[in-house]
Amino acid sequence: MSRPNKEPRYRSGLEKRVCNNLRNRRIKFSYEPYKLDYTKEVKQGFCPECGSKVMLKCHQYTPDIVLDNGIHVEIKGKFTGEMRTKMIAVKKCNPDIDIRFLFQRDGWCTKNHKMRYSEWCEKNGFDYAIGEVIPSEWID
């Protein structure tokens, strides 16, 4: 039997610190409240019935935090290529949902240091912040 006020199991220490900061600021939010559906194209896919080479696979994405104003916040330490591809697909399939990123630091997307996380967000139309605190302007 679980306790009603039991703290959720966070996926990282960063998520826990961000959520604790929101609680300390008395900001209402939900942690991983639901899943959003999205599709990704299957590489080298083939439909045996119609012969189409365009195949889609259904996936689900769980936002880290949803603020009471409807803003979805994805909290990231490391931001891999796989995650970047996934988030573009999530946004494409859910265009009316405001998804933003809170990065622990503005790291490099690639080993050759050609693009930072912030530059990737700007290029792909995502709002973002750097640090461990959700900006006040996202809440007001």
Please give the residue ranges for each predicted region.
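Nucleic-acid endo/exonuclease domains
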Residues: 1-140
